[in-house]
A protein has these predicted regions:
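Nucleic-acid endonuclease domains
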Residues: 1-219
């Protein structure tokens, strides 16, 4: 399924509760965890898509969900992709070009759905916003992403050279950041380039909360 094919259904989520959406189809997900991807999986099933391990959710793009307050303001950053398998593409003498990177492939066409999870009963969780952005339609934004990517790569390299532990640490651009994403037992990142571990935990790219503020103004 292409993202445009899902556009109408995704727009119609805004203002509805999880319970209202669940009544529209037979869910194979028995319970929803706030941070375990349940809502994203529910939306894919709502759209008639399979739950598989493809690089992107749609044939031409990716679905992301974001926890918000009741007014649609982001309460957390938005996970994009882990970096352990591509670390040397980021910290090599010449980092891989952003427009050829795994990061670009993951974000070149994105549908972003906000959901307020303040109620203890997940049936009362309410969808608060729906945004889309793409490389095709938002060239200026992707120039910012490119700048963020370059800035983050330089910060990661600098941390390895100058930090006390010679590990990477949280690195920020304007709309994108790299920070730790892991749970015990931790998964340190090994760099073949440096022939050593360059972190004590796994790390990942995230969209910062500032991105949704920008997208709201862009509407």
């Amino acid at each position: 399924m292409f993202l445009n094919d899902a556009h109408k259904k995704l727009i119609n989520l805004k203002g509805k509760t999880v319970g209202e959406i669940l009544t529209q189809f037979e869910s194979r997900i028995k319970e929803f965890k706030i941070n375990k991807g349940g809502i994203g999986q529910m939306i894919l099933l709502y759209l008639g898509l399979p739950l598989d391990s493809k690089l992107t959710d749609f044939d031409d793009g990716e679905l992301k969900t974001n926890k918000t307050d009741k007014d649609g303001n982001s309460k957390e950053t938005i996970f994009i992709t882990q970096i352990s398998s591509i670390i040397d593409e980021l910290i090599g003498e010449k980092s891989k070009d952003f427009f050829q990177s795994n990061l670009f492939k993951k974000i070149k066409n994105v549908a972003l759905v906000g959901i307020c999870k303040d109620d203890k009963d997940f049936n009362n969780w309410k969808f608060t916003y729906f945004y889309t952005f793409s490389f095709e339609k938002n060239k200026k934004l992707f120039n910012e992403f490119n700048n963020d990517y370059k800035t983050i790569c330089e910060q990661l390299k600098n941390y390895i050279k100058t930090s006390k532990d010679n590990f990477i640490h949280t690195s920020n651009g304007k709309y994108i950041q790299v920070r730790s994403k892991d749970s015990k037992p931790y998964h340190p990142i090994y760099s073949k380039k440096f022939e050593k571990y360059i972190s004590n935990k796994n790390h990942a790219f995230y969209f910062k909360k500032d991105l949704t503020k920008f997208l709201e103004k862009l509407k």
